Amino acid sequence: MNTAIIYVGAAIAEIAGCFAFWGWLRLGKPVWWLAPGLLSLALFAYLLTLVESEAAGRAYAAYGGIYIVASLAWLWSVEGVRPDRWDVSGACVCLAGAAIILWGPRG
């Protein structure tokens, strides 16, 4: 499976799972919100195991850039807060770092 697709799926699963906890603790949502949150976090962890990488830490580090961009998309689409120029600039820097980690020459 394509690494980018796995990372995007993992990001959505992680953000949704964490938001379920946020909703319960910060927004007063019912405790049953934790059940889909836990399932979503388990899916996130599973998806990261599908990434072709010799080292887990490298897979997680590269994923970080995708997570940040997905978090800003969530901020805008779910929470209704438009990312500002600093959010976008920071995300671009993180994506550049993720690209270096993913595709940098090894050896």
UniProtKB/Swiss-Prot annotation:
SUPFAM superfamilies per record: Multidrug resistance efflux transporter EmrE
InterPro entries the UniProt entry points to: UPF0060
Matching Pfam families: UPF0060
One GO CC annotation: plasma membrane
The protein's name in its UniProt record: UPF0060 membrane protein RPB_2370
Membrane topology classification: Multi-pass membrane protein
Family listed: Belongs to the UPF0060 family.
Localisation: Cell inner membrane
Keywords in alphabetical order: Cell inner membrane, Cell membrane, Membrane, Transmembrane, Transmembrane helix
Domain of life: Bacteria
SS bond partners: none
Record's keyword annotation contains Membrane: yes
Keyword Transport carried by entry: no
Transmembrane segments: 5-25, 31-51, 61-81, 85-105
